[in-house]
């Protein structure tokens, strides 16, 4: 099941329309327009669906609509949260309404029910036979993975506080330990393509509470810990390990990566970006990455872009779906993808409409 549209608003900011999502996606925009907020919002919605803690829940209000494609079915799930209560909730399948809820009543398949005010209906009506679509949404949420690329810190050793995942919190050691020799070799070969001259990756158990990942680099005598690597190398290698780990697990429903490429040089940003986007397309993993990195923008086709602009509390997504002429006309300018973003082309085009 794939997320095809994401709509969201809260007390201090709102998407003016739903963001359409494809198999792979790049969120771009200037600083402080809302790229990280969009990724964090999807993460928070996954948490709420799973009844996990939502540490960044807005104090007063948020509302979201998630639209999925499941083979031939279109599933649209909407809910609104206000003052610790669910004030709206609806579920439609191919345009047919199965669930409606407001502050006065809740109808599920035409029957009146009374879910607790602070619970989604799918929390209290789980049944794989009677309500299979609830289970599909929950399974989707269980398989949302993510990573804050810019917060991967070599000083954290095996800790992975940078990960955005409601239920999957495996650390670096656990991921490497679970991989076969072939998978480890895949990571080494991918690292070498990025000009990181790794020769070996292995785990080391000193005592029960001290478990390490050890790296061997060409022409370096001593073994290296993750904390011995440069910040850029640490970020790239951590992403490669997660990428391989995900490839041997049940594939994730959605992989969120915030600030992709931050801290890497031109050559490695380009190579890692191509590697990641190609990997996700080939493995059928939906990817949503954010970046304002010049180099990364130039290697990701504009059809996969969502450009965010902000006017006060309103965040405006621009994409080939809602502005086809903007994107199609740009192909004839001869400019680079980054010029599309950084020049006044967009503002001139939108003002002329």
What are these regions (language model features)?
Residues 44, 262-263, 295-296:
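Residues immediately C-terminal
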Residues 251:
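Conserved SF1/SF2 helicase motif Ia
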Residues 258-260:
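Walker B catalytic acidic pair
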Residues 254-256:
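Walker B motif beta-strand of ABC-family P-loop ATPases
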Residues 1-47, 54-61:
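Pre-Walker A-like glycine/lysine-rich segment at the N-terminus of P-loop NTPase domains
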Residues 48-238, 242-246, 337-347, 351-353:
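Phosphate-coordinating catalytic segments in nucleotide- and nucleic-acid-processing enzymes
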Residues 270-353:
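C-terminal lobe/lid and adjacent interdomain/linker elements of RecA-like ASCE P-loop ATPase modules
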Residues 266-267:
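Helix N-cap at the start of a conserved alpha-helix in ABC-type nucleotide-binding domains
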């Amino acid at each position: 099941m794939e997320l095809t549209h994401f709509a969201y608003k809260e007390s201090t900011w709102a998407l003016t329309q739903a963001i359409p999502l494809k198999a792979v996606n790049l969120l771009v925009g200037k600083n402080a327009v809302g790229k990280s907020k969009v990724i964090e919002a999807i993460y928070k919605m996954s948490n709420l669906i799973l009844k996990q803690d939502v540490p960044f829940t807005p104090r007063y209000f948020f509302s979201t609509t998630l639209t999925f494609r499941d083979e031939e079915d279109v599933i649209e799930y909407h809910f609104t949260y206000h003052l610790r209560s669910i004030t709206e909730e609806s579920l439609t399948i191919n345009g047919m309404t199965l669930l409606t809820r407001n502050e006065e009543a809740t109808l599920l398949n035409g029957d009146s029910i009374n879910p607790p005010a602070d619970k989604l209906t799918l929390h209290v009506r789980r049944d794989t036979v009677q309500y299979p679509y609830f289970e599909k949404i929950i399974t989707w949420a269980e398989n949302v993975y993510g990573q804050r690329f810019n917060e991967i810190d070599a000083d954290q050793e095996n800790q992975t506080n940078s990960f955005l995942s409601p239920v999957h919190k495996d650390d670096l050691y656990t991921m490497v330990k679970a991989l076969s020799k072939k998978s480890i070799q895949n990571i080494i070969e991918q690292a070498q393509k990025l000009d990181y001259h790794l020769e070996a990756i292995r785990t080391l158990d000193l005592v029960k509470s001290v478990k390490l990942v050890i790296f061997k680099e060409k022409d370096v005598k001593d073994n290296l810990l993750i904390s011995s690597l440069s910040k850029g190398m640490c970020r790239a290698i951590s992403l490669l390990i997660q990428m391989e780990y995900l490839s041997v697990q049940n594939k994730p429903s959605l992989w969120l990566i915030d600030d992709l490429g931050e801290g890497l040089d031109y050559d490695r940003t380009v190579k890692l970006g191509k590697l990641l986007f190609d990997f996700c397309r080939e493995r059928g993993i939906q990817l949503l990455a954010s970046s304002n990195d010049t180099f990364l923008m130039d290697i990701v086709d504009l059809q996969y872009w969502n450009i965010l602009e902000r006017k006060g509390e309103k965040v405006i997504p621009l994409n080939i779906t809602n502005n086809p002429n903007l994107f199609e006309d740009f192909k004839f300018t001869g400019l680079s993808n980054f010029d599309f973003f950084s020049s006044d082309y967009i503002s001139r085009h939108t003002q002329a409409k």
